[in-house]
From Swiss-Prot:
<keyword id="KW-0997">Cell inner membrane</keyword>
<feature type="transmembrane region" description="Helical">
    <location>
        <begin position="118"/>
        <end position="138"/>
    </location>
</feature>
<dbReference type="GO" id="GO:0005886">
    <property type="term" value="C:plasma membrane"/>
</dbReference>
<comment type="function">
    <text>Plays a role in cell envelope biogenesis, maintenance of cell envelope integrity and membrane homeostasis.</text>
</comment>
<feature type="transmembrane region" description="Helical">
    <location>
        <begin position="4"/>
        <end position="24"/>
    </location>
</feature>
<protein>
    <recommendedName>
        <fullName>Inner membrane-spanning protein YciB</fullName>
    </recommendedName>
</protein>
<keyword id="KW-0472">Membrane</keyword>
<feature type="transmembrane region" description="Helical">
    <location>
        <begin position="25"/>
        <end position="45"/>
    </location>
</feature>
<dbReference type="Pfam" id="PF04279">
    <property type="entry name" value="IspA"/>
</dbReference>
<keyword id="KW-1003">Cell membrane</keyword>
<keyword id="KW-1133">Transmembrane helix</keyword>
<feature type="transmembrane region" description="Helical">
    <location>
        <begin position="76"/>
        <end position="96"/>
    </location>
</feature>
<dbReference type="InterPro" id="IPR006008">
    <property type="entry name" value="YciB"/>
</dbReference>
<comment type="similarity">
    <text>Belongs to the YciB family.</text>
</comment>
<keyword id="KW-0812">Transmembrane</keyword>
<feature type="transmembrane region" description="Helical">
    <location>
        <begin position="49"/>
        <end position="69"/>
    </location>
</feature>
<feature type="transmembrane region" description="Helical">
    <location>
        <begin position="150"/>
        <end position="170"/>
    </location>
</feature>
Length: 180
């Protein structure tokens, strides 16, 4: 539950900061503060922070700080693109190397045949590359308000749909001792 809250908390703070705090600058500040609090809480309570969370928070701190210092919202808008590309490369390379990163993230929930983990890695990489393109199209062609609404009300449903589309692969290739 803490992991979920640490990932959704900064998004909620960003949304609230934009619509109730006065725009991208406030939203960015709220997101930065919330992200630092969340990652600190994860470390204090769980004594660990995932590599993906560290990467995500680092990119946020850099792009968010540049946004606040420069006053240019472009930097916070390209943060998702940068993260999606980084994550896409991580999942793609782990599939190519036959050492699927996604296996370590999901193995406590589902156990699959090894080739299924590799397939899931490639699909996840493709999803992240797709999301990078979508983010670029939205932020470059839409208003700040539309981009913020897309980040909250578009990305989450798209991600959920992607996960649902993976269920047939998971169910077909799960091992007998799998939890799902």
């Amino acid at each position: 539950m803490l992991k979920f809250l640490s990932e959704i908390g900064p998004v909620i703070a960003f949304f609230a900061g934009f619509f109730y705090g006065g725009g991208i600058q406030h939203a960015t500040l709220y997101m930065l503060i919330t992200s630092v609090i969340c990652i600190t809480l994860c470390y204090v309570i769980d004594k660990k922070v995932s590599k993906l969370s560290i990467i995500s928070t680092t990119v946020l701190l850099v792009s968010g700080s540049i946004t606040l210092i420069s006053g240019d919202s472009m930097y916070i808008k390209i943060k998702p693109t940068i993260l999606y590309v980084i994550f896409g490369i991580i999942f793609l390379m782990s599939g190519i190397r036959k050492n699927p990163f996604i296996k370590y993230a999901l193995e406590s929930i589902v156990r699959l045949k090894e080739e299924s983990w590799i397939t899931l890695s490639y699909r996840t990489a493709a999803f992240f590359f797709f999301m990078a393109v979508v983010n670029e199209v939205v932020w470059r062609n839409c208003s700040d308000e539309t981009w913020v609404k897309f980040k909250v009300f578009g990305v989450i449903p798209i991600t959920f749909i992607f996960i649902l589309l993976q269920l047939p692969l998971l169910l077909k290739n799960k091992l007998p001792d799998s939890k799902i």
